[in-house]
Amino acid sequence: MKESHFFAHLARMKLIQRWPLMRSVSPENVSEHSLQVAFVAHALALIKNKKFGGTLNPERIALLAMYHDSSEVLTGDLPTPVKYYNPEIAKEYKKIEAAAEHKLLSMLPEEFQEDFAPFLLSHSSHEEDSQIVKQADSICAYLKCLEELSAGNHEFALAKKRLDVTLQERKTPEMEYFLNTFAPSFELSLDEIS
């Protein structure tokens, strides 16, 4: 049996800092972020199913969200302003991400690659599932901005404005429900939510 370095690589998600160009009151790594995105994506799928007639699989979507940034163990976390500086850079970076996804998948024993492919290869997942994960990813970035701003860190003011626009562009009934129901608490202190 051949050794696999797959999970050793995934364990390094905790070493990759998000928001690398920003001063943060509370630093965040890719592992923490992925778990929060999984929580939110799962909730968005449940909200869509229960409130807006969806037929999604919330558990599959949560799993997809857990792995959504896993290729960053090979690429690092490129800051959003750099990644989307212009369409050419964004297009080339997508190619780099795809190559990293395939490299990560190839680290698994062959008998498990088919099982992991839908979660590791961004082009393999259902479009609707991917959209929910993208929505959750944007919401989590927005919530991070709320937390930082609430702690007095104005470094995140511009990022929040940018995310206000992104959330408006991606707006769905389930996102609106989530944001109205859960987001205000992120601006409160522990005493206020206890």
Swiss-Prot record:
**Enzymatic class:** hydrolase
Its taxonomic path starts at: Bacteria, Pseudomonadati, Pseudomonadota, Gammaproteobacteria, Vibrionales
Known HAMAP family for this protein?
5DNU (MF_01100)
> What this chain does, per the record?
Catalyzes the strictly specific dephosphorylation of 2'-deoxyribonucleoside 5'-monophosphates.
Organism of this sequence: Vibrio parahaemolyticus serotype O3:K6 (strain RIMD 2210633)
Instruction: Name the InterPro entries for this protein.
Output: HD/PDEase_dom, HD_domain, YfbR, YfbR/HDDC2
Protein's cellular compartments: Cytoplasm
Site, as annotated: Appears to be important in orienting the phosphate for catalysis: R18
Question: Which family is this protein grouped under?
Answer: Belongs to the 5DNU family.
Q: Which coarse location class applies to the principal site listed for this UniProt protein?
A: cytoplasm
Where are the coiled-coil regions? none
Please give an example of a GO cellular component term from this record.
cytoplasm
User: Which cofactors does the annotated protein need, by name?
Assistant: a divalent metal cation
Q: Name one GO molecular function term.
A: metal ion binding
Q: Which reaction does it catalyse?
A: a 2'-deoxyribonucleoside 5'-phosphate + H2O = a 2'-deoxyribonucleoside + phosphate
The UniProt entry, under CDD domains, shows: HDc
| Any one Pfam family match given in the protein's UniProt record, by short name | YfbR-like
Query: Do the record's keywords include Hydrolase?
Result: yes
What this protein is called in its record is 5'-deoxynucleotidase VP0926
